[in-house]
Amino acid sequence: MPELSDCSASLTKEDIKNFEVELNVKIPAGMKNFYLKFNGGMPSPYCYQPQDEDLDRVEINAFFPIKERTNAFETIEVIAKDIWSRNLMPCNLLPFAMDSGGNYYALNLKNKKIYYYLTDEWDENASREYNFETNTRYIAQSFNYFINHFIEEEE
């Protein structure tokens, strides 16, 4: 599991419960435990090799905090509501982290798997549904698997 720096204020179980109520979501226990330890921040190590072998390793720039923003990042609540309201991401994906290029890591709220959501490959001439499907890449079977398989950067 990575260590995170530049985290937001510590959370309580009540904070997480309020977060779930506010967004009308249910996050897995592993994600709750991670956020009780690290409320957002920058991970070290910061690389991950997706379970989909067709994908190259990815880098995680930051995890978004719950409840209180950091100096650099807004909260999951603000980011999710903004993206969902502008119909830029399916509402069944909860963005919780991003890479340095502005692409998101998201929890699928239905199957609890983790996906890499590309924002820099949006096709203005295609439907939202097409963009949603082609820009969503499976990378981990669960949040626990995701956070427990970070790897050191390769030279």
Where are the regions that the model predicts?
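Pocket-edge structural micro-motifs
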Residues: 97-98, 109, 118
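A surface-exposed partner-binding patch
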Residues: 1-103, 151-155
